[in-house]
Amino acid sequence: MDAYSLAQSGAGARTATRADFIRRTYLHLAGAILAFLALEYYLLNTPAITNPLVKLAFGSRYGWLGLIGGFAVGGWLARSFAANVKSTGAQYFGLALYVVLEALIFVPLIVLAVQYDKSGTTLKAAGIMTTMLFAGLTGIALTSKRNFSFMRSYLMMGGFVALGLIVLSIMIGFTLGIVFSGAMIVLACGAILYDTSRIMHEFDTSQH
């Protein structure tokens, strides 16, 4: 076998390995989403958990800020565990921790949404829109083969600005409004493209 054939064989093996890694990654994502939905259903039907969370979030001006702060710290820990390439167990622990944190912080948000729209139409529409948006952006990132890692600094800057505005709105008491909501959607779209790009181009194949 000549050098060219060896190179082609190696490239093919790497492509197959990366494709298998991407498949395993999104299987784990699907499992995490199902776990989130099951846990969310349990939490929302357990008043002993739901009521304290809602009271903490909306009982005082700084309650929601405390929840966001706890989620940020917990999310950082979860990502640290999930990024551990030496321990599969640590990766699974990080994933599980993040699912639990997401489920907890969504409880007061869902309760609030149901209070405003008891028919559930708003929640259903938000779920459908989120699913379509995620699927579309993920498909773009996977098929375009473009590396979106350059977006990291912009996303970090946008995240810090958003967090600062949220803190100010809670402390001062002003409403952020529809423009801020739209900006958060744009930021979330950028994060989806960035993370999908990292899965394709940067992550080790053991980090599924």
Residue positions per predicted region:
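A hydrophobic alpha-helical transmembrane-helix feature that marks the membrane cores
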Residues: 1-208
